[in-house]
Amino acid sequence: MDLSKSRLAEKMLLFLYSLSKSSNTININTYKRYIYLYYLTSSFLTGGSDNIDIVIEKGDIRIIGFDSIISDFNSKEYIDIDGNSVIVNDELEYLVSPLLKNDSGAFSYQYREIQPFVNLLQSYSDQFVFTVFFSEPTFKEASLRGIKQMRSSNSRLKGLLSSFQAKLNNADIDEYDILTYWMDYILKNYYIETGENGAER
């Protein structure tokens, strides 16, 4: 497994661990969109430099390496797959929990970056996350221009959030606040106005 795929696998494992704290059953498409949005915002939120390659297919995305990593997790019995659902098994917690006991370790550091992001997205409904995904400027531009493959480092969302932060010029507002404001803007101007009610904070 190459380095970028290995890092993706670690993040996918930590996302599943974080998500399973509220429910062991996770919609695989929502999970994939969480990963996508995390990579497109991580350089803004945390200064991260990891990349994923993304293929745009029929108005949706395929993350290179995602399917094979999911299959690997399944074969190791960390998860079960039931249609569009990922069911997190106890084996995943048995693997991850001991690794997080070292507070100064790289795995724990990644978890502390991922956990607040998961908490933020989980405060919205899955349907709203779907709307955010289709309203995200990188995906919109790639779709309009007919781009079939891109790297997460080409994120237009990072620039949008950075510009918004610069205009506010307020040291008390952190990066997660900026992301929340953007998501609330989508909630008010796209989600509710198009009749997609039911988003819950």
Regions found by a protein language model. Give the residues of each.
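Domain-edge interaction signal
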Residues: 1-201
